C-alpha cells in the first residue's frame, strides 16, 4: 500500500515539476518582443499539447522509473 502512495506522490510531484517548466517557457514566449501575438499563441498551444501528452505519460506510469522516462520525453 505504501508503494502505491509513493507512486501517486511521485506522479503529482512530476506533474508539478513539468508544469513549472512549461510556465517558465510560456513566460519566456510572452516576454519575447520578436514574436507576434499569433506566433506566441501558436507556440503556447503546441507547448500545451506536449504538456498534456506528458501528463498522460506520467499518469500511465507504473513505476518511478517510468515517471522519469515520461518527464524526460518532454
PLM feature segments, named:
Residues 1-74:
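Amphipathic alpha-helical assembly segments used for oligomerization, scaffolding, or translocation
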